[in-house]
Structure formats: C-alpha cells, structure tokens
C-alpha cells in the first residue's frame, strides 16, 4: 500500500517555506514541520481504510522548572526525526472521576497527535481539533481514550492534544506572577501549531473545526470569546458544556484563598503576602506532591472536583496575551465573540456524572442524605448564584426536583431521576441554553442544536460510579456517553459490538464530519435538521428552539432522529424564575 505523494505538498514557493520536504516510506511516513521532522506509522480505520498516524509531536516547550505556572512558549526546533509512533505522556493528574485514583502522567505533556486518512485527490483536507474532557483536572488526548479509528473513515484530518490540568493549568495569583488560565493558553498554543503546520500534513488551515466535550466543550465556547484565539479556527462544536455553565465561569474572588491553602499544604505559607515568593516556592515542589494536594481540598466524596477555576486577567507587558479579559457573560451580552458556524448540544442525563457515584456508593449516599442541605448547597454553588437567598433556592429546588424531600430516596425512581435532572440542569443544561439564547440574540448564526438520548451497551456512568454496587434503577444516557460513538477508547471500553451501537457510531461520525466538511451536519437535508434562524433573534426564547433529538437503544431496532422543541422547557423555566446572579432579563 502506498500513499499518494500529493497528500503531502511540497511548498517551496509559498508562505509555508518550512515544509521544505515531505517524504514517506510505505510503513513509516515522514513529515517536516516548522520545527523539525516526525516519523509516523500507517494504521487502519474501522472500515480498513489506511491512515497515517503522527503521535507525540511537541507543540510547546515542556512547562517545567521556571516555565511552571507560565504561559506556554513555542517548542524548540529539533534536528532529528521524532518517533511519532506512540503516544507521549499525558498531563499529570489525579483522575477522581474513576475508582482508585492515583497521580499519573507527566508535567512534560504538551504534545499533540495528527491523524491523516488516505485520499486519492490533491485537495487539502478539512481539520478537526478535539479538546478533551475531564473537568479541567483530568483527561487526555492520547489514543487509548480518544482513538481516531472511526473518524478516519472520513475525509478529514483529526488532531488531539493534551493541556495542563489542575494546579498546573489553573493556579492563579491574579497578577503577573501567575496570571492563570494556563491550560486554556495551552489549547491556544496547540491551535497555533495547527495553524502553522497542518498544511505539511495535507490539512487546510482555513477549514479548522474545533470540538470538545464537557470541559473541552466549555473550552470551545470560551475560544469563541477569547481574543487570544482569533483566526485560529472557522467552525466549532460544543458537546455538553458552554461558557455560561458555572464551572466555566471565572471565579477570581476564590483564588486568593485557594492559593493560600495550597501554600500551607506545601510548606510555602511563610511566603504569604508575596505572590512572587509563593510561586517561586511552589515551582520547587515536586510535581507528584503538588498534584496530591488536591486531596486536601476535598470536603465530601470528590467535591470540589477542582478548587481551581478560570480567571479574568489584565493585559500587561508580562502578560501580553490574556485568555479572558472579562466575564464571559459580559462578553456575550456585548456580542464580543466569533459568530461562526456552531453545533451545540447535550446528552439526556448529564447529571449521571455525579449522581452515579453519590447514589451507587452506599456510604457516600448515607453521608449525603445525612447532610443534604449543607452538601448540596456547596456542591451546586448555590451561594455563588443566590447569596443570602441560597436557603430559599435550595427549598425551591427540593420542592421541584425531589418532591419536597431533602434526600435521595433510592427506592423511589422519581427521586433518583429527580436528582439526576437537578445536577444535570444546574451543571450543564441551563448554562447551555442561556449561552445559546444570548448568542442568538446577538446575531450568532448559523447554530445547530441537538440532544443525545441513545442508550448503548456501554456507559461512562458505570465508570463514574467507581463501584460495582447498584440500586434498582434504570440508568439513562450519561455525561460523556456520546463520546463512545465518535472515538474508539480501548483504555476504557471494549469494541462496540451491538449492531445499533455501530450504526449510531457511524451516524454520529457522519454528523460531525459533515459539519467539518460542509459546515452543516445535515448538508443534504435528509433529516430536516436546520440551523436556528430567526428574523428577529433579539426576542428569541427557549421555546422557539428546534432541536435534533437523537434517541434509541442497543436492544431494539429503532433509532430515531426527530427535530422537535426542547423536552425540558419546564426545568429551564424553573431556573429562569429563580433570583440568580447569572440570570439575565426575559430569558426562558
């Protein structure tokens, strides 16, 4: 098998002069980037299509030593061929989402993978860049979690990458000593690398679609807003996360306390009062020890998922390219964001992310029910939204979702589902709808919306539960379950086996790659999935939105694709009626 030479263009006389030679051998293709050459391998897609795999390409200098807690810097050129046949280390983390978490990964982790399908033509291919999930404290872009085999059946190039997490990615002293948002700035650096180098791989840097799930989804939306990301992509897909979800909002006021606590945990508290001295001290702490400090912040179960957050930054000589200069809500209200083709959606039961472990772990459930009001107030950031009225908001929530009871009754399916809905709406659905409405009102089009409610053989909910124990309840479609059909994940799940699961996977891949190729998930209108288009968008309401509902399961023959109104209008209306700081007029 040979790849046609026109996959790799020789660009001696263009602005891409660094692509001086692009050569290959039948089994180990070689590509020259701006910084040096990479030897890849030839692999095969689900449908046995050959594709080239280039893994472990550095897109920034290792963020270690003096570069810890600093914005990423471009990689140093290399004068040898990088072995791109295996994944590079993922970013150091402790993944509390899964059972028996331990510190793993490396601080030297800013690497990306590029996957290029075999094609017969000479035209540059559209590019899809995936931003991984993980709550900004876990996750990876490596092929054991984000495998390319399904997408490589289509005529697109796929790029995956790592970015700094937890304390390494999001510590902030709110000044030039550690301005913060380093993980998001890593994402920008990866996009810059793609912009500068993807043509060497046969990709079109004017047809780049960024897409992400959960934390990656919120990141995608923030890239629409950030001035640092301008011009680096042309389309976007957000899966289960948006800029107005609370976990994607900057929380500057909390960070001084977080930094002070971290200093105490690491023996750096003598330097309190001098952010420079604190950061200098923290740079000397061994990476594993620093990662372990996340344990010290936990007050219940794995809460908080992470104490670190996005922050707004000031542009200074020492911080010339801040990622966020104001709260995303203010940017959206001002219409200060990229109005490019955007596909956005969620899964039916987002709340399983935390409901599964809280309910399926008996001791955890007992603790939660014994201290329900206090713990739920903390977990769902009620004081952030309602201030002194948090207790009133809590009562309204329990009345609406839990039948007026301040506990989860595992013997009552309505109670279990009610808690799933409560967590999912608070953490995901409401912020997504807020974001879409506000962006529509500011003239953003085209936008496509979807809701994913297909129940397959496997579920991330079983991973998040972190136990084999269960309750008598039929669990629905969990947060992250859509990923099962876009990416092979051999580090987490066996191969898809059920006919319907495989069919769903091929359909989802078609939607996503159609969007990347044509700017439309349903370009031939086979399913009448139209973008949201309003003559007077300034008055649009949630009830006006037409959403693609994807439903079915692996046990029956029917998979359905229906464009309908939202199925959770009553739940969105509930939150819109509450006195929340993040609410804005005439929403609902």
Swiss-Prot record:
It holds the Pfam family COesterase. This is Juvenile hormone esterase. The active site is at 214 (acyl-ester intermediate), 350 (charge relay system), 479 (charge relay system). Residues 1-23 form the signal peptide. May function as a juvenile hormone (JH)-specific degradation enzyme in vivo decreasing JH activity. Hydrolyzes JH III in vitro. Hydrolyzes effectively also methyl hepthylthioacetothioate (HEPTAT), a synthetic substrate. Of the general esterase substrates, it has preference for 2-naphthyl acetate (2-NA) and shows a weak activity for 1-NA and 4-nitrophenylacetate (4-NPA). Disulfide bonds join 91-109, 268-281. PROSITE patterns: CARBOXYLESTERASE_B_1, CARBOXYLESTERASE_B_2. PANTHER family: CARBOXYLESTERASE (PTHR11559). It is found in: Secreted. It comes from Tribolium castaneum (Red flour beetle). Keywords: Disulfide bond, Glycoprotein, Hydrolase, Secreted, Serine esterase, Signal. Transmembrane segments: none annotated. It is an enzyme of class 3 (hydrolase).
